[in-house]
Amino acid sequence: MKKLTKFLTSASIGLSLSAVIFLIKDYIYDSAMKEQDIFTILIAIFVPLFAIGTLLSVLLSKKIDRQKLLTFGLLFSGIFIILLTYLNIYHLQMLMPLMKTNSITLAVMWIARIMGGLTGLFIGISFGATVKNGVIHYILLVLFATGIFALGRFMPALISYEPILYTAGGLSLACALLNSYIETEKTKNE
């Protein structure tokens, strides 16, 4: 069970990281925001906060158990990826039909900035906690990220971005629950 959870955790972080970095660009571009260069802003916020999250994970791992950090990071990165995917222009127009399109576009831009930054922070925390688990998990993480990147670049017409982003968020949430369960069982047995 532990090996499966570690494998799924590595897959989840790799999928989340690559989905946000590589797939969100085309997803936002397809969401009627062609005139806005939101991806550059999202990545400009995502990357530094990812680095801060990784640094926080390293610093906090001395005071807080790595398993708790991993669960915390996975839980919130999953929530923010799902929210980032759901709150696009089309969904916001359905939720608020009386708002002007310009206002909705502006709202989506702010949502993408905030959610991109928060997602980067929590994926960074998860990444820092996972890399300490061993070289195999780091290699798996990189392989999943590379695989999603290849899918996004070489077969863009065949892939719908929304299911991949929802899968990344859902897998992060599932791994957070599995890691939480393992942590609870470990404390019960002690």
Description of each model-found segment:
Residues 170-190:
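Multi-pass alpha-helical transporter architecture, strongest
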Residues 152-170:
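A membrane-interface helix-boundary motif in multi-pass transporters
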Residues 47-55, 121, 145-149:
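Residue-level signature of mid-helix packing/kink "hotspots" within the transmembrane helices
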Residues 75-101:
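C-terminal ends and interior cores of transmembrane alpha-helices
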Residues 95-124:
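Hydrophobic core of transmembrane alpha-helices in multi-pass small-molecule transporters
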Residues 53-66, 156:
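Helix-to-loop junctions at the C-terminal end of transmembrane segments
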